[in-house]
C-alpha cells in the first residue's frame, strides 16, 4: 500500500472516531426514564493492519448503559421520585478526544497532500528527460 492509501485508511478511522465523539457530545444531555438504559457512548478502537496495509476500525465499543440517576422533577421522563437517567459522558474527556482525533485527521490529510506533491514532482522529472 502506498502513502496515500495508508493515510486514506487513517482518514477513514479518524472520520469514524470524530463521528462517535460528536454523537457522544450531542447525546450527553439526553435524559431517559430510570426504568430504561441511558444513552451509551461510542468508543472507536483502531488497529494497525498487517505490514503496510494501513489502519482499520477493530471495534466500536459501547459505554455504560446504567448512566447516572439525577433529580429532575420537571422532566416529563421523571419517575415518581422526580429522577431521570443521564448518560455517564465526561465532556472534558470527549473534548480531549475530539482534539486528538482532529489533529490525527489533519496529519493524515497532510500526508496525502505531501504525497501528491511528491508524486507530481517525480512525474515532472520523468517528463523533463
Placement of each model-derived feature along the sequence:
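Amphipathic alpha-helical polymerization modules
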Residues: 1-129
Amino acid at each position: 500500500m502506498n502513502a496515500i492509501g495508508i493515510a486514506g485508511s487513517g482518514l477513514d478511522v479518524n472520520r469514524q472516531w470524530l463521528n462517535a465523539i460528536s454523537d457522544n457530545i450531542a447525546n450527553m444531555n439526553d435524559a431517559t426514564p430510570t426504568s430504561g438504559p441511558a444513552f451509551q457512548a461510542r468508543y472507536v478502537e483502531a488497529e494497525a493492519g498487517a505490514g503496510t496495509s494501513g489502519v482499520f476500525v477493530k471495534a466500536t465499543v459501547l459505554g455504560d448503559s446504567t448512566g447516572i440517576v439525577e433529580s429532575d422533577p420537571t422532566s416529563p421522563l421523571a419517575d415518581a421520585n422526580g429522577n431521570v437517567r443521564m448518560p455517564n459522558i465526561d465532556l472534558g474527556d470527549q473534548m480531549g478526544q475530539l482534539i486528538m482525533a482532529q489533529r490525527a485527521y489533519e496529519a493524515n490529510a497532510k500526508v496525502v497532500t505531501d504525497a501528491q506533491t511528491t508524486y507530481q514532482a517525480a512525474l515532472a522529472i520523468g517528463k523533463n528527460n
